[in-house]
Amino acid sequence: MQTIIWNHLSETEKRKVIMRPVQQNGENIQQAVNAIRENVAYNGDRALFELCEKFDGVKLDKLIVSADEIQAASSRISVKLRNAIEQAKTNIEAFHKAQQNQEIDLEIQEGVRCQVVTRPISCVGLYIPGGSAPLFSTVLMLAIPAKIAGCKKIVLCSPPPISDEILYTAHLCGVETIYAIGGAQAVFAMAQGTESVAKVDKIFGPGNAFVTEAKRQVAQNSTAIDMPAGPSEVLVIADESADPEFVASDLLSQAEHGADSQVILVATCETLAKETALAIERQLALLPRAETARKALNHSRIFIAESLEQAVEISNEYAPEHLIVQTKNARKLLPYLDNAGSIFLGAYSPESMGDYASGTNHVLPTYGYTKTYSSLGLADFSKRMTVQELTPKGFKNLAETVEVMAEAEQLAAHKMAVSVRLAKLNI
């Protein structure tokens, strides 16, 4: 990791050094995803079977995972892992239940009643990546709030063969239907519907560049998505009180996600920065994914800030997905931290806790989107509607205000909708 003293940079250099690596979602990916979209649209299930064999190397005779298969998978999960998943589920449920909205019902003025009511999104689709490290924890993060929100139908897609852990966790969380479909084709199947796959209203979940591009495309039509996605990232603010071994482990826990991940340390102490760099090398030697982590470290940075105030400014400008604060009084910085997906305060709040079991959601905006997007929560699985109800007296008292405004905007029909009612009231 390159170490840079922040105050030695010009304003132009500062903007440049906190830029993320360019995402390689080029024309080739877009063209490939376009072809998959058209194939699924025209050929439905047949396309899904063909693409599964082509990309996953699995020849399926059905797309829906049977209850017997789910039961068999669940029986192979160790008691130790079951207990861990159930503990995480309990914590995540508690935190997301606390997010349930109180409905707003106000009399704004006499005879004018306004409300906000919340309704669940009817049908949601969850995408869970497969591969050598199945992300069953993401099932918890998506299915639990969907269930609490009251979504009527929850379906899940994951590339075959689906891991036992994913099947067990999905069943535990009440997912009704599981499809053995992966990649961009899964996104298009859920967005468009096929003979076997239910069309959904909103799609959630992470994925590779092809899945991300597919989600971008469906979001331009009639299917909503959770949020824009990019490579995973973490920024750590640390002062002289921080433990370099802790800081190094937090940086590496993010770097091991992928070669395109980025990790940033903003330290107010050069000694800590040097000790952390040495600790990273020691810990790297112990990691199975050391090669991946090292690639991520190649485009990561250590910034030396003159103060915690400056460290906060750097963090707010970078707007990280994960923000870890390892300082003497971490909570004192919280009021000044504006842009982050999830914040981890103190030496004993590693990102791993939020990734799995503290209760917060690990589905977070990346690539600077935390300036405008929030971490996933219960609200993402529901929608708000406003309601207004006026009595004749309330209508009469507000009528002139609306007529004047409608006339000023030259919308005669808007004014007429008020005038005809006033006439009926014999005013």
From Swiss-Prot:
Zn(2+) binds at residues 254, 257, 355, 414. It comes from Haemophilus influenzae (strain 86-028NP). Pfam families: Histidinol_dh (PF00815). The active site is at residues 321-322. Belongs to the histidinol dehydrogenase family. Catalyzes the sequential NAD-dependent oxidations of L-histidinol to L-histidinaldehyde and then to L-histidine. Its EC number is 1.1.1.23. One of its GO terms (cellular component) is cytosol. This is Histidinol dehydrogenase. It is an enzyme of class 1 (oxidoreductase). The keyword Transferase does not apply. Binds 1 zinc ion per subunit. GO terms for biological process: L-histidine biosynthetic process. HAMAP family: HisD. Pathway: Amino-acid biosynthesis; L-histidine biosynthesis; L-histidine from 5-phospho-alpha-D-ribose 1-diphosphate: step 9/9. One of its GO terms (molecular function) is zinc ion binding. Its cofactor is Zn(2+). Transmembrane segments: none annotated. Substrate binds at residues 232, 254, 257, 322, 355, 409, 414. It catalyses: L-histidinol + 2 NAD(+) + H2O = L-histidine + 2 NADH + 3 H(+). SUPFAM superfamilies: ALDH-like. NAD(+) binds at residues 127, 185, 208.
